[in-house]
UniProtKB/Swiss-Prot annotation:
This is Purine nucleoside phosphorylase YfiH. Optimum temperature is 44 degrees Celsius. Maintains more than 80% activity at 50 degrees Celsius. Keywords: Copper, Hydrolase, Metal-binding, Oxidoreductase, Transferase, Zinc. It catalyses: adenosine + phosphate = alpha-D-ribose 1-phosphate + adenine; S-methyl-5'-thioadenosine + phosphate = 5-(methylsulfanyl)-alpha-D-ribose 1-phosphate + adenine; inosine + phosphate = alpha-D-ribose 1-phosphate + hypoxanthine; adenosine + H2O + H(+) = inosine + NH4(+). The gene is yfiH. It comes from the Bacteria. GO terms for molecular function: adenosine deaminase activity; copper ion binding; oxidoreductase activity, acting on diphenols and related substances as donors, oxygen as acceptor; protein homodimerization activity; purine-nucleoside phosphorylase activity; S-methyl-5-thioadenosine phosphorylase activity. Its EC number is 2.4.2.1, 3.5.4.4, 1.10.3.-, 2.4.2.28. It comes from Escherichia coli (strain K12). GO terms for cellular component: cytosol; outer membrane-bounded periplasmic space. Gene3D superfamilies: CNF1/YfiH-like putative cysteine hydrolases.
């Protein structure tokens, strides 16, 4: 059976959300087994079966709107097909039954909703998108005030495994000097805490109800795919929608 993660947060009645793991699919190594990514070399039939299993396990009301993620900061407002382009790293919806989704395999998935349960969003935040402002752009799509927005940080590479060069630290500090607290020197490189960086960015725009951020895709190899660990691997996905 497909194993799902259900966010532990004060979710409004009108909102549903879940995040997949690598457990419960049909894909063969190195995509074993619940790979949802059709772009990483897996058998397309296996990916389709995995998606069917996931949609059933998560009780999704419709097929998710899959994005063409490019490590940027653009947000696609889900108003119904057809879309001129799905090239974006976040999606927003205020329409019941429309599923926001992002794929990850180390990058940070962030799910959003407002306390009233009338708006939702999902963002893909790798370090480039996070630094460029994808979370801030997503928050700006909400009609509600930032203090009424909840954010859940899904499974990403943890602070003991995310080694980066000095240029990554410098890029974040150029935007916010407080970002230095999220980097620890590790030889001639740094260990970066993507969860802390996300919390800083969200707090800077008034979002302070932040949950999750306690898993590591890199070290929890039996539960999660990790691009940095395995290079050729599958993808998880995180979903949120209005009921």
């Amino acid at each position: 059976m497909s194993k799902l993660i259900v966010p532990q947060w004060p979710q409004p009645k009108g909102v549903a959300a879940c995040s997949s793991t690598r457990i419960g699919g049909v894909s063969l190594p190195p995509y074993d087994s619940l790979n949802l990514g059709a772009h990483c070399g897996d058998n397309p039939d296996h990916v389709e079966e995995n998606r069917k299993r996931l949609f059933a396990a998560g009780n999704l009301p419709s097929k998710p709107v899959w994005l063409e993620q490019v490590h940027g900061k653009d947000v696609l407002k889900l108003t119904g097909e057809p879309y001129a382009s799905k090239r974006a790293d976040a999606s927003y919806s205020n329409t019941p039954g429309t599923v926001c989704a992002v794929m990850t395999a180390d990058c940070l998935p962030v799910l959003f909703c407002n306390r009233a349960g009338t708006e939702v969003a999902a963002a893909h935040a790798g370090w480039r998108g996070l630094c460029a402002g994808v979370l801030e752009e997503t928050v700006s799509c909400f009609a509600d005030n930032p203090e009424n927005i909840l954010a859940w940080l899904g499974p990403a590479i943890g602070p003991r495994a995310f080694e980066v060069g000095g240029e990554v630290r410098e890029a974040f500090m150029a935007v916010d000097a407080k970002a230095s607290a999220a980097f620890i020197q590790h030889g001639d490189k740094y260990l970066a805490d993507i969860y802390q960086l996300a919390r800083q960015r969200l707090a800077n725009v008034g979002v302070e109800q932040i949950f999750g951020g306690d898993r590591c895709t890199y070290t929890e190899n039996e539960t999660f795919f990790s691009y940095r660990r395995d290079k050729t691997t599958g993808r998880m996905a995180s979903f949120i929608w209005l009921i």
